[in-house]
Regions:
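Short gly/pro/ser/thr-enriched loop/turn and capping motifs at secondary-structure boundaries
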Residues: 1-3, 107-108
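Phosphate-binding site of ATP-dependent enzymes
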Residues: 58-139, 160-167
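Short, well-ordered amphipathic alpha-helical segments that serve as non-catalytic structural scaffolds
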Residues: 140-144
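Active-site nucleotide/adenylate-binding loops and adjacent lid/helix of ATP-dependent enzymes
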Residues: 2-86
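Short, intrinsically disordered, charge-balanced linker/junction segments flanking boundaries
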Residues: 1, 22, 191-195
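Conserved metal-phosphate-binding beta-hairpin within the catalytic cores
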Residues: 81, 92, 145-177, 187
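Glycine-rich phosphate/pyrophosphate-binding beta-alpha loops
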Residues: 51, 106, 172-186
Length: 195
C-alpha cells in the first residue's frame, strides 16, 4: 500500500512495467518550477488521497499557486500532463480486473467533493466501451496491480483521450467502501458483497 500511496514511485513503476501513464515530473519543496512544463497540467501531492491536494492548472502562475497549496499536504509533488477525455476506474481483486466503471462528473472534475457527494457524478458500470478497449484497460489495470506488488484489492484510475489512448493515473489500495464508492459498485456487478 505504501508504494501505491507514493504517486511518483507508482508512475516510475508503471513506466518500467509497461503501464501507460501521463508524462510527469516530480518536485520537492524548495525546488524551482522548470520553465518547460506544458499546460494544462495537473499538480498532485505525492502522498494525497481522495483527490486532496490535486489541482488543475492552465499556466505558470496557476501552477506556482497550486504548488504552494499542494506543499501544505506533502513535501513532494508531481506535475503531470493533463489528459482530456473520459475517466474510468477499474477495481482489481486478487489480480483479476472487475467490470470497468466510467465516472462523469456533472461539473468540474472528480475531486474530493464529487467523490463523496451522492448525485455529483454519473457512474456507468459496466462502462460503455467496445470489447477490445475493455480488455485493454482491464489488462493495464491487472498489470499496474502486479508492478506495484499489490496482493489484495485496489482501484486503478484511468483517463482515455479522444484517440482511445488510455493512461493509468494512479492506484488506490485503500479505496472507499461507502455506498457511493466505486469498487463496491464494480464488485456488485460480479456478485461480490462487502456487507
Amino acid at each position: 500500500a505504501a508504494v501505491s500511496m507514493d504517486k511518483a514511485l507508482s508512475k516510475q513503476l508503471f513506466r518500467e512495467g509497461g503501464v501507460p501513464t501521463p508524462y510527469g515530473i516530480s518536485l520537492k519543496k524548495g525546488q524551482l518550477l522548470p520553465q518547460d512544463v506544458s499546460y494544462p497540467a495537473v499538480v498532485k501531492a505525492c502522498n494525497g488521497g481522495s483527490s486532496v491536494g490535486v489541482y488543475m492548472v492552465n499556466d505558470r502562475a496557476e501552477c506556482e499557486k497550486a504548488l504552494a497549496q499542494a506543499y501544505a499536504y506533502d513535501d513532494a509533488v508531481i506535475i503531470e500532463q493533463y489528459i482530456k477525455g473520459r475517466e474510468f476506474s477499474v477495481g482489481v481483486i486478487e489480480g483479476k480486473a472487475l467490470p470497468i466503471i466510467e465516472i462523469a462528473p456533472i461539473e468540474g472534475f472528480y475531486d474530493y467533493k464529487n467523490k463523496y457527494q451522492a448525485g455529483s457524478t454519473v457512474e456507468t458500470c459496466p462502462a460503455v466501451l467496445d470489447e477490445a478497449l475493455t480488455k485493454e484497460m482491464q489488462h493495464y489495470a491487472e498489470l499496474a496491480y502486479e508492478v506495484l506488488h499489490i496482493t489484495s484489492y485496489a482501484r486503478l484510475d484511468f483517463m482515455m483521450n479522444e484517440k482511445n489512448e488510455m493512461f493509468c493515473l494512479e492506484a488506490n489500495t485503500l479505496p472507499g467502501m461507502t455506498p457511493t464508492s466505486l469498487l463496491p459498485q464494480e464488485a456488485a456487478v460480479m456478485g461480490y458483497n462487502f456487507n
